[in-house]
From Swiss-Prot:
One of its GO terms (molecular function) is dopamine neurotransmitter receptor activity, coupled via Gi/Go. Glycans are attached at residue 3. InterPro entries: Dopamine_D4_rcpt, Dopamine_rcpt, GPCR_Rhodpsn, GPCR_Rhodpsn_7TM. It is found in: Cell membrane. Dopamine receptor responsible for neuronal signaling in the mesolimbic system of the brain, an area of the brain that regulates emotion and complex behavior. Activated by dopamine, but also by epinephrine and norepinephrine, and by numerous synthetic agonists and drugs. Agonist binding triggers signaling via G proteins that inhibit adenylyl cyclase. Modulates the circadian rhythm of contrast sensitivity by regulating the rhythmic expression of NPAS2 in the retinal ganglion cells. Polyubiquitinated by the BCR(KLHL12) E3 ubiquitin ligase complex: polyubiquitination does not lead to degradation of DRD4 protein. Forms homo- and heterooligomers with DRD2. D4.7 allele exhibits higher affinity for homodimers compared to DRD2 heterodimers, while alleles D42. and 4.4 have similar affinities for both. The interaction with DRD2 may modulate agonist-induced downstream signaling. Interacts with CLIC6. Interacts with GPRASP1. May interact with ADORA2A. Interacts with KLHL12. Na(+) binds at residues 75, 117. One of its GO terms (biological process) is phospholipase C-activating dopamine receptor signaling pathway. This is D(4) dopamine receptor. One of its GO terms (cellular component) is plasma membrane. Residues 225-261 are annotated as: Disordered. Residues 233-242 have a biased composition (Pro residues).
């Protein structure tokens, strides 16, 4: 990997360079300060509530929600370690007023936490695909070990992607100390591909295969249910007692906590069926989480890699700043998504708010 300086580019990563704002005391600086404080507060409150809810409520302790807690942890670290310095830089008009070493640490944390978010979403898609493709094998090995292993791998890989920044890669000749950004164009391309452009298609393909498998299983199950229903006699007279139909139990989607159940579950399987229902609810929210992530982060990575691949292209600093803000807003969206689309999260959130207020 080369070490070509990007000093002639305006803020390849987060727009933290001169010209991104109006300077301290300007209306733009005031808006950045108010927006930044609100964003940090929303990210901290929402994601802390997600972690506490899963830890305190047994109904939320499902394999999918283990990954959601890991995702919330990445957002919490972003709000604690990255956003305060980013907001301060925006308030100062994009001028970096701290040491280059702190800038490198900020860039590394920024890359690692964004990468951890997308890798966690990829890990969820891989876990769901295995649960649907080979459910019997998955159930024999269930118990949280696989999920914890995947979560550990996502964080190790994320740290590996970000590590070069802390190993001197960002120390380019002619570096402007008033600008905090990634200085090596080759690394910008490498990190963009590893953090976004490579994992996103893999994740979407796995989700497509997972939900396609679920639809096939549901269709086969409905066919089996229909075939087992007793037929009514063709002649007159009331049907015999055994032919009287009873309301059918709600259908369950196969998940890691239950094998592919038969249409009629015996009493001993009731608890397993309930866990299946919980996991189904957890899976329902995932496409919305993935969609929100792609909407918020795709513009950032497109602008990010364009500035690296096309040095002659003038990427306006304000555009870089705007897409960076949009990406960070995603960290506050996930708790809102869980509240809207998951009744169990909603109930626990209400309970927690009643205790606090």
């Amino acid at each position: 990997m080369g070490n070509r300086s990007a000093a002639d580019a305006d803020g390849l990563l987060a727009g933290r360079g001169p010209g991104t704002g109006g300077g301290a005391g300007s209306p733009g600086a005031a808006a950045a300060l108010v927006g930044g404080v609100l964003l940090i507060g929303a990210v901290l409150a929402g994601n802390a509530l997600v972690c506490v809810s899963v830890a305190a409520e047994r109904a939320l302790q499902t394999p999918t929600n283990y990954f959601i807690v890991s995702l919330a942890a990445a957002d919490l670290l972003l709000a604690l370690l990255v956003l305060p310095l980013f907001v301060y830089s925006e308030v100062q008009g994009g001028v970096w007023q701290f040491s280059p070493g702190l800038c490198d640490a900020l860039m590394a944390m920024d890359v690692m936490l964004c990468t951890a978010s997308i890798f966690n979403l990829c890990a969820i898609s891989a876990d769901r695909f295995v649960a649907v493709a080979v459910p019997l094998s998955y159930n024999r090995q269930s118990g949280g070990g696989r999920q914890l292993l995947l979560i550990g791998a996502t964080w190790l890989l994320s740290a590996a992607v970000a590590a070069p920044v802390l190993c001197g890669l960002n120390d380019a000749r002619g570096r402007d100390p008033a600008v905090c950004r990634l200085e090596d164009r080759d690394y910008v391309v490498y990190s963009s591909v590893c953090s976004f452009f490579l994992p996103c298609p893999v994740m979407l393909l796995l989700y497509w295969a997972t939900f396609r498998g679920l639809r096939r299983w549901e269709a086969a199950r409905r066919t089996k249910l229909h075939g087992r229903r007793p037929r009514r006699p063709s002649g007159p007279g009331p049907p015999p007692p055994e032919a009287v139909e009873t309301p059918e139990a709600p259908e369950a989607i196969p998940t890691p906590d239950a094998t592919l159940a038969e249409p009629a579950l015996p009493a001993s399987e009731e608890r397993r069926a309930k866990i299946t229902g919980r996991e189904r609810k957890a899976m329902r929210v995932l496409p919305v989480v993935v969609g929100a992530f792609l909407v918020c982060w795709t513009p950032f990575f497109v602008v990010h890699i364009t500035g690296a691949l096309c040095p002659a292209c003038a990427v306006p600093p304000r555009l870089v700043s705007a897409v960076t803000w949009l990406g960070y807003v995603n960290s506050a969206l996930n708790p809102l998504i869980y509240t809207v689309f998951n009744a169990e999260f909603r109930a626990v959130f209400r309970k927690a708010l009643r205790l606090c207020c």
